[in-house]
Swiss-Prot record:
In the N-terminal section; belongs to the N-acetylglucosamine-1-phosphate uridyltransferase family. It comes from the Bacteria. Binds 1 Mg(2+) ion per subunit. It holds the Pfam family Hexapep. Acetyl-CoA binds at A377, N383, Y384, S402, A420, R437. Its cofactor is Mg(2+). This is Bifunctional protein GlmU. Mg(2+) binds at D102, N224.
Length: 452
């Protein structure tokens, strides 16, 4: 028995007021439907079927890296009709998990609980109890057992009082699902083929029906407009903030961070306001992150201080380093232990050695910088000739004077000193002093120009 998922993503989403298909709107930096696809993968689904309609070409472009079966629903005739389009991809002995492309926050643990409750030859429904169930299909029970689902528009006044509602997410045996889908009717207030009708069919055939519930109602909320989308974003970010705090991070304001990927932190981490985490971020112990920083796909060692407005992307920062304010580490930047990068310093594809410092106004690209090197303010590695990139190598304990230009490819030896304002184009040997600038001239009697 294998797991097959069917993800419904055919809706146009007119209330979004957007040319973008609804399921391509993002929560936490990732499209809603990608959240759902990732969940299916994490559950070990052997087949993922994505039922699409509106904006199919754009969907396929943006989700091209996913291994899914693309299933067209040419006419939107209801959820039952949508699932039926995937029948040819469903085996009789499969467990079929039905998910929704605009319901991105369902936790893997919740779906695992639903699957664990699914009878081998039966049906399990994910339900939730709501204080205000308006708009949802109500779960019908007799002596505690599920017997059916009634949609809001078809419900009686008594049934509208029921607080347990259908989330739409269910798991069912493949053979039974295909049988029931073939017998659906559209004789209802909506004139649609309701997937929910299979619950009553199961009951009438004596098939076992079970249910499970999520840990939080927001797990099963969808987004039909941008207000609801913002609500999903805030719920997700609140959960991420709680997880960070439980793992040893102090947040200056839990409502003012954004996690758009995964963050792993050590103990005693301090995170100030408006910090954004993207991709995979790993943070060690005793790290301080100032306000308005962006960390993307990076590793931060223990006892690091990251000052305000610093950007770190695809970079590695070892223990005891200090960055910022207004520093930028671009892809391939590596700071070794106890190195410093200060305000308005940018690094790309550069290794800054242990104990080295670039504290002010520098660009360091395609460089290997040794230990205990001082990079003076305004220093630039001139690594690009308009076509190719070249490398700058600086030995241990070198001193680079302020406002120097190091024209790559160039090698600066250990203990070498570069005079301020120099343009270095040739190798400087170990312990040499290099000065490459115009000779100063002082002119007596010079008169400033005057306005005519």
């Amino acid at each position: 028995m294998s797991l097959t998922t069917v993800i419904l993503a055919a809706g146009k989403g007119t209330r979004m007021r957007s040319a973008l298909p609804k399921v391509l709107h993002k929560v936490a930096g990732k499209t809603m439907v990608q959240h759902v696809i990732d969940n299916a993968k994490a559950l070990g689904a052997t087949t993922t079927n994505l039922v699409y309609g509106h904006g199919g070409e754009l969907l396929q472009q943006q989700l091209a890296n996913n291994n899914v079966n693309w299933v067209l629903q040419a006419e939107q005739l209801g959820t039952g009709h949508a699932v039926a389009q995937a029948n040819s991809h469903v085996n009789d002995d499969d467990t079929v998990l039905i998910l929704y492309g605009d319901v991105p926050l369902t936790k893997q643990s919740t779906l695992e609980r639903l699957l664990a409750a699914t009878p081998k030859h039966g049906l399990a429904v994910l339900t939730v109890n709501l204080a205000n169930p308006n708009g949802y299909g109500r779960m019908l029970r007799v002596d505690g057992k599920l017997v059916g689902i009634v949609e809001q528009k078809d419900a009686s006044p008594e049934q509208l009082l029921i607080s347990e509602v259908n989330t739409g997410i269910m798991a069912v045996n493949g053979r039974l699902l295909k049988s029931w889908l073939g017998n659906l009717s559209n004789n209802n207030a909506q004139g649609e083929y309701y997937l929910t009708d299979i619950v009553a069919m199961a009951h009438s055939e004596g098939v076992e029906i079970t249910s499970a519930q999520p840990d939080h109602p927001m797990e099963v909320e969808g987004a039909n407009n941008r207000i609801q989308l913002a609500g999903l974003e805030r719920a997700y970010q609140a959960w991420q903030a709680q997880e960070l705090m439980l793992n040893g991070a102090t947040l200056a304001d839990p409502a003012r961070i954004d996690v758009r990927g995964t963050v792993t932190t050590g103990e005693d981490v301090l995170i100030d306001i408006n910090v954004i985490f993207e991709g995979k971020v790993t943070i060690g112990h005793n790290v301080e992150i100032g306000p308005n920083c962006v960390l993307k796909n990076c590793s931060i060692g223990d006892n690091v201080i990251i000052k305000a407005n610093t950007l770190i992307e695809d970079a590695t920062v070892a223990a005891k380093c200090t960055l910022g304010p207004y520093a930028r580490l671009r892809p391939g930047a590596i700071m070794e232990e106890d190195s410093h990068v200060g305000n308005f310093v940018e690094m790309k594809k550069t290794r800054l050695g242990k104990g080295s410092k670039a504290n002010h106004l520098s660009y360091l690209g395609d460089a290997e910088i040794g230990e205990k090197v001082n990079i003076g303010a305004g220093t630039i590695t001139c690594n690009y000739d308009g076509v190719n990139k070249a490398k700058t190598i600086i030995g241990n304990n070198a001193f680079i004077g302020s406002n120097s230009s190091l024209v790559a490819p160039v090698n600066i030896g250990a203990m070498a000193t570069i005079g301020a304002g120099s343009v270095i184009t040739n190798t400087v040997a170990d312990e040499q002093l290099a000065i490459a600038r115009g000779k100063q001239r002082n002119l007596d009697g010079w008169k400033r120009p005057v306005k005519k």
